[in-house]
C-alpha cells in the first residue's frame, strides 16, 4: 500500500542518514571566550547535529590545537620582548652574511619559527588553556636553546649589543634594521677614522650621527668621507 511504502521509504532514509552520521572529536580555540574547547560533535557532512563536552583531553592533541592557534594568529601571540627581538635579529644577520654557503647559524626567522613550532614550543604548552596563559611562557629560554654551544659566545663576539667609541662610551647597536644602526653623538667619534664594523669586519654599521642635544645631524656608512667632506665643509 501507499502508506506502507511511504513508511518503508522513511525507514530507509533514516538508515541512510544513520550511516552518514559520524562522531567527530573537535578541539579548537573559542575565539569569543579565549579558551580551548573540546567537544564531540555528531555530524552529517558539515552539518552539526549535536555537541557534547569532551573530558580527559589527549595531551598531544591539546598541544597540537594550541600550536595550530599560534600558527594561525602569528608569533605576536607569544610574549616577545624588545630584547628578544634584538637577539633574533642578531642571529639572523649572521645567517644572512653566510648567504651562498652552509651557515652554522640556525634560521630563526618568523617563518621558520612558525614552521617548527612542534619542535621548540609544543613541549612547553602543557599548562596553557586560556589566552592569558601565553604570557607566562618563557619563550626567551626556548629560543635560546636553539643556539648550540659555542654559538651564544660567538654571537656576542660577532654581533655585539654595544660598540665602544673613542669617548669611552659603550653605545647600543639597534639590529631592528639592516644594516644595524649606531646612534651616537658626533663628538663621541672624534679620533675614529672610519665606520665601525662588526661580524669579523663583514658588516659596516649605519651611523646616525647626533648633535650634543641628540638631534639628527647625518646618516652615513662612510665616516671617513663624512670627515673629509660634510664635516670639513661645516668647519669652514
Locate predicted features:
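Short, surface-exposed, low-complexity cationic segments
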Residues: 175-205, 209
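Short, glycine-/Ser/Thr-/acidic-enriched flexible segments
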Residues: 9, 170, 178-179, 187-189, ...
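Amphipathic alpha-helical packing elements
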Residues: 154-186
